[in-house]
Amino acid sequence: MRVPLIISGPGIKGGSESGTPVSGSDLLPTIMDLAGNKTIALTEVDGGSFASILFNKDNNQVERSVDGIFFHVPYKNGIALKRPHSAIRKGDYKLIKFQDDKSTLLFNLVKDKKEQLNLAT
């Protein structure tokens, strides 16, 4: 869930960084917002615009129609967890549930960036 996103453009300060989590579902609302198009209601898409974060370092919130960032991997893959799972990131925490054995992992991502201490056990 921690994949860098690099954005460059007019009005965006070079070398600036933000630790605010965003997801692929935030890209459409952000692009629409940057283009000045307000026709997509927040309730019509899962993501939210992070345009204000690009121009205002004091802002660190993405307003979404749902609270948290959701991920679902319904198949086995060779990346990361390698098992079908679903995850939600909300605030400082990430909760993962595996489909095969119903096991659960819970991590505080601020205190445990490497996700070593499972708080669900």
For each of these PLM feature ranges, what is it?
Residues 112:
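Intrinsically disordered, low-complexity polar regions and short flexible loop motifs
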Residues 13, 20, 25-28, 32-109:
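C-terminal cap/loop subdomain of S1 sulfatases and analogous C-terminal strand-loop tails that border
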Residues 119-121:
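Short, intrinsically disordered, charge-balanced linker/junction segments flanking boundaries
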Residues 1-12, 23:
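Histidine-centered active-site microenvironments of extracellular/periplasmic hydrolases
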